[in-house]
Amino acid sequence: MPLISIDSRKHLFYEEYGQGIPIIFIHPPGMGRKVFYYQRLLSKHFRVIFPDLSGHGDSDHIDQPASISYYANEIAQFMDALHIDKAVLFGYSAGGLIAQHIGFTRPDKVSHLILSGAYPAVHNVIGQKLHKLGMYLLEKNPGLLMKILAGSHTKDRQLRSILTDHMKKADQAHWHQYYLDSLGYNCIEQLPRLEMPMLFMYGGLRDWTFTNAGYYRRSCRHAEFFRLEYQGHQLPTKQWKTCNELVTGFVLTHHS
């Protein structure tokens, strides 16, 4: 799989499959591109692209602190390097913050915005505790954190091993910074600027992000929402068939 140069000092590793409308997948802290294991099947319909953000997986580490704005600029540069003028962005969990940031800072880059487990700010207690617990375990017992994350995403032993092995490659300082900046990030005031077609996917009561849907319903009235009752936060892996069907239908319906 290829490495691509973003600037003279940094290379990003990515996987790419299929042809047609490009969809770029943006992962949450630590997990890297492997969390989108099942979204590779979307290559039947689209050109699907899975980068490891810098400091994650097989991409280069960086000398400066990671942040939502930094990674948003990195994805825009990544698109330029691949000669992609505009793409569908799929952001999962905190990866959705990066996708949203690109959406209102570089709307010319985004044809559609698809967000699974999205939030514009971490305002509820559960979300705050999860972010702080992630940072604490990363400092005290990173192996346990990786085990928890892998286990919460799948019951499949092989995929759990794939996810864990990939998380071990992440630079823990940048993983921590990604958590920290996600915890402090707030783009609620910018949401009305997101005018591209948008799809939001949430789980049920076990998905801590679902309460954030109200922010988007008020500010992005053109957006579409889909809730999977009785499901948790980890839709790309645990409900991948429905997730992929929603992506396919949404993009093809709104493609001009």
Swiss-Prot record:
GO terms for molecular function: hydrolase activity. Pfam families: Abhydrolase_1. InterPro entries: AB_hydrolase_1 (IPR000073), AB_hydrolase_fold (IPR029058), AB_hydrolase_sf (IPR050266). It comes from the Bacteria. Its EC number is 3.-.-.-. GO terms for cellular component: membrane. It is an enzyme of class 3 (hydrolase). Residues 22-122 form the AB hydrolase-1 domain. Induction: Repressed by RghR. Keywords: Hydrolase. Belongs to the AB hydrolase superfamily. This is AB hydrolase superfamily protein YvaM. The gene is yvaM.
